[in-house]
């Protein structure tokens, strides 16, 4: 069974990391992507570290529901995926890629929360163009970037870093990856950290 799971995981990783993900997007969608060119890779100072309790927050989702981080305490591992901005090349490729690995999150008893400093109308338009996402998309628009600032990943230009933060069922931060804003975070790191949580 584990051999089959590893084969499926390898296939999912290949698909997720493949440039074909971008090419599969419609031309109309790609025409709306704003490319600012290379940006300063990291432009913030972390305020949290592994082993600490994650700062709690409540943000509104695209469905209009409010999502609070602590609502998952004792129930689910949480993966926070912070993106810098909607309608940008890396972000527009990253989130749709998670659609092909939903089972991976389910298997590791984890929920994915996508967070952006963009407004709800902007996120609504952007995610509608990219296609349905299975995870909640949350707006950290007002007070602007408040949640990103709590974690220390708000950049000087008002966008968030591209960051992955994994929080266990006890609410403790177990993994932080603030990656080069010009690159998509590696999925294999998320897989590895979720496997560690499952193994205890």
Language-model segments: which ranges?
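N-terminal targeting signals for export/organelle localization
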Residues: 2-60
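A short beta-strand-turn-helix
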Residues: 48, 57-78
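Short loop/turn microsegments at loop-to-beta-strand junctions
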Residues: 54-55, 79, 161-163
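Short active-site neighborhood of thiol/selenol oxidoreductases, capturing the structured segment around
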Residues: 68-98
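Structural microenvironment flanking redox-active thiols in thiol-disulfide oxidoreductases
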Residues: 92-133, 143-147
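Structural micro-motif
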Residues: 134-135, 153-165
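Short acidic-hydrophobic, aromatic-tinged amphipathic segments that line or gate anion-handling sites
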Residues: 136-140
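Thiol-/selenol-based redox modules, centered on thioredoxin-like
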Residues: 159-200
């Amino acid at each position: 069974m584990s051999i089959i799971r590893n084969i499926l995981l390898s296939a999912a990783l290949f698909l997720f990391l493949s440039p074909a993900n971008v090419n599969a997007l419609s031309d109309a969608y790609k025409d709306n992507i704003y490319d600012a060119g290379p940006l300063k890779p990291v432009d913030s100072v972390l305020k949290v570290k592994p082993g600490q309790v994650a700062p709690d927050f409540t943000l509104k989702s695209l469905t209009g529901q409010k999502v609070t981080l602590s609502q998952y305490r004792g129930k689910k591992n949480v993966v926070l995926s912070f993106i810098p901005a909607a309608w940008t090349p890396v972000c527009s490729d990253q989130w749709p890629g998670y659609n092909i690995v939903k089972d991976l999150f389910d298997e590791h008893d984890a929920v994915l929360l996508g967070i952006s400093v963009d407004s709800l109308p902007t996120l609504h338009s952007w995610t509608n163009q990219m296609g349905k996402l299975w995870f909640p998309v949350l707006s950290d628009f007002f007070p602007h970037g408040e949640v990103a600032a709590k974690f220390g990943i708000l950049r000087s230009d008002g966008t968030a870093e591209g960051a992955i933060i994994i929080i266990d069922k006890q609410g403790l931060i177990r993994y932080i990856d603030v990656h080069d804003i010009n690159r998509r975070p590696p999925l294999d790191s998320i897989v590895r950290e979720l496997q560690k949580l499952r193994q205890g």
